[in-house]
Amino acid sequence: MIDAGDANPNLILILTDDQGYGDLACHGNPVIRTPSLDRLHAEGVCFRHFHASPVCSPTRASLMTGRYNFRTGAIDTYLGRSMMHPDEVTLPELLGAHGYRTGIFGKWHLGDNYPMRAMDKGFQEALVHNGGGLAQPSGRPGDGYFDPVLSHNGVWAKHSGYCTDIFTSAAIAFIARHRAEPFFVYLATNAPHMPLQVADEYSGRYLAMGLDEETAKTYAMITNIDDNVGRLLASLKELGLERNTIVIFLTDNGPAVSRGVDRFNAGLRDLKGSVYDGGIRVPCFLRWPARLQAGREIDEMAAHIDLLPTLLDACGAPLPDGLRLDGISLLPLLLGAAAPWPERTLYFQWHRGDEPEPYRNCCARSDRYKLVNGTELYDLIADPGEQRDIAADHPEIVARMRAGYEAWIEDVSATRGYAPPRIHLGTLHENPVTLTRQDWRGAEGWGNEHLGYWEVKVATAGEYDITLRFSARLPAREAHFRLGDNSLSQALDEGATACVFQRVPLPAGDARLEAWLEADGRRRGVSYVDLKR
């Protein structure tokens, strides 16, 4: 139970992007400088075996819903497979209903258009970039880590400074404005995700140590994050909010490391995208001075799906009747309760494609054993580096864990299937709508050589102005647009970068939207489609 004086604690969830378990000094990295995160680790409670999904959107969906990402629609990172279904109930929605002020600063990556944006899913304030990161096809032209173009509550504008500094400053300002109310801040940095862009004052320190450029810049971006965490913690103290604020730090998956680069990973096997522990075991520590004993470490296994029920439990916020969660509250563990902890098995899977394939890049993990791809078995107590496959010695464990996995994949797949949610056109919530290659379907990439389409819902019948935007470098003689029975084309002048179709009548309903360029019989995708009712 939570004392009345400690009810409704403030919540700050810090999630970094592609920072691995070994990318912290407190986890044994002999090179990186992370004093603020080390302090948070020392002053909080640390989960030694905390797990996320192998890549980012799936982790974010599970954090926001307390459910396995396969239930939510967010099964991958792009091509329409990172959009979370709008009927999923989210942590900020539940906290907002409990009287919390809610704000997100940084990376959402669960849908760029209505009704799937962060501002549609419970965040009352949202300063975010599109898609999976800055300087990607989902972003606005001229995007980058310095002076980025960001959406603030749906309004796009260029912001001065470095992305992580901007997001942290906005979070601190939000906290100051709402210090008299309980608040939930989701500070989700896009750093240290590639491209590796950071000030020379940060990277120079690591380059001087003789590190390769990739590692040096990655560590530099993490040290910048650490400096910003220090600013955030200092602001809590200055505002008198430190005691009853829960600060959670974790990362979204294992480290992203290029082939041939040797980076410290605390002895864990493999990297981002893998279901070996190097891909899914992540740092996680929580500081709550009012209730948690500093310096404790928890050996019990936990995962991203557990944070929503844990935080709701800490806040006394109720769950809606009938809402099914996969996670469980970790609050008894955090408070040091002596009650026995239930045994359970967690499941993780990720690969490209429109739906999961059984036994492809998957694992089932209990407190002791881990089954990888249905055939490899590891004793994680005796072999935390997952080097010795003992499947042949324990066929009964393999059979039991395979049965558990098969029941799990059938269950999560039956939730709603894997058809993507539709982007809505012509609503009051978003007009105009900009479609990007982030969410197109039918391709296996988002480069100029690829061609895709968008699954949309025309919410309001009427006339729309439609603009196709593209690079002048592309050879193109004609621009084409098609939605339902509407099929339009227009000749292009040499060097053109846009094509406008005016007052196009679109009927209400579900439809497939296509837009492409054509030259010499070859089709290429456009960069953006803008639709204004």
Positions of predicted regions on the chain:
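Formylglycine-dependent sulfatase
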Residues: 1-373, 380-410, 417, 434-450, ...
